[in-house]
Structure formats: C-alpha cells, structure tokens
C-alpha cells in the first residue's frame, strides 16, 4: 500500500507539471489577447473578460463540458448554473463535468456534486484541474487560468481550432486523470471508525502484529476485520483494498 501511495504521489506531481505548462501557455494567450468591453461579436475569436458568461449555456444544443472548482460555488452563480444545466439537459444536451477534489472537502461539498448530477451532469472528480472551463458545442469556451505571475485571467474563445484543443485537453483529463467513484466517502460505505484507523495504519505500512498491539486486539481479530473490509469494498487483496480506500476517500474521512 505504501508503494501504491508513492506511485499516486508521483502521478499527481507529473500531472501538476503538465497543468503548470498548460496554464502558462494559456496565460500567455490571455495577455496577448485584446481586452474588450463587448465580446459578443462573432468576429472576435478570443478576448480577455472579467468572468464567465453563462448566456451560451442557455443556447447549448449538443454538448456542454465544465471544469469546476470552489470558485464556482458562489451561491447565486451556482444556482443559475444549475438552472441553465437542467434546461440544457431537458433539451437533450450532453453534460460532462470535472470537479476539483477540493470541492468535496468543503462543508457540504458532496451536496454540490449531487445537485450537479440532479441537474443532468455526468460527474468525475480530479485532484487537479487543467483550468476552470465552460465549453459549449465546441464553438464557444470560457477558460480561467492562473498564469506564471500568479494572476487569474479569463479568456473567452470562439476560435474553432482553439475550442478543439480545449476539448481534447478535457477528454484527456476525463479518461486518464479522473475518477467517477471519488464522490463516495465513508458516509456512502458502512465502515466504523476502527476500520478507518486500520486502513490508515495499513497505508502507513504497519505490520499486523504492531497494528493489533496498538489497537488492543489480537492479530486474528485484526485479520478478520481486514477480511470483512475487503468484502465491503469488493476487493480480493490488500493492495486492491488500499487503492479502493483511497478512491473512496476513506483514508481522509473525518472520524466521529
């Protein structure tokens, strides 16, 4: 399990470097774009704007892609987003959304995910986002990035080529960097505090004898609990148990 966590950290670090490169490139694109007070003209292929425009969601016909983080959870904005997404879903629009894992860590974070699902969005969760994004029908995009100078900028894009590039980045993250099970937590899986502690001790590489001693139980009882845990999480090995526990965020759940 220790090797699994080390490998996971390396993947996250590699992804972080990739995202830094993407954000830097898009940040340069933002700075080189003309700043306009009116970006509604179809001739403007890209321009820097103050914030995401929701109006294109109302006109969505085929597909909406979103990358959301806690900045998108401002109450009035989020409520309007849900309203637009639900309307699009009723029109038959496909909606896919990658949510930053940090959203789940917020108080009531899982309820935000559930509201998005109720509105018709298919949800996946990622440790890191390439950028905040709204892409509508592959012809209009809003991308928000933090450039290498730490400045947050939003770019409105109407260029078909750039929208295609953004779509490819989203698809890559959707397939390779996200989990559809990451919204599950100890609340959704019936585990006790003692079982969560055992999972954490396993993740730290502690031997059975040492774990049993620290918990004040016999090694036989410990192994029975681990076997029961494997059954609950639907796995057949301790390695799979560690992977599934991390996937369901059991290693970081709050004990009662």
Swiss-Prot record:
PROSITE patterns: HTH_LUXR_2. It comes from the Bacteria. GO terms for molecular function: DNA binding. Residues 184-249 form the HTH luxR-type domain. InterPro entries: Sig_transdc_resp-reg_C-effctor, Tscrpt_reg_LuxR_C, WalR-like, WH-like_DNA-bd_sf. Pfam families: GerE. Keywords: Antibiotic biosynthesis, DNA-binding, Transcription, Transcription regulation. Residues 208-227 bind DNA. Involved in the regulation of the biosynthesis of phosphinothricin tripeptide (PTT), also known as bialaphos (BA), a natural-product antibiotic and potent herbicide. This is Bialaphos biosynthetic pathway regulatory protein. It comes from Streptomyces hygroscopicus. The lineage of its organism: Bacteria, Bacillati, Actinomycetota, Actinomycetes, Kitasatosporales. The gene is brpA.
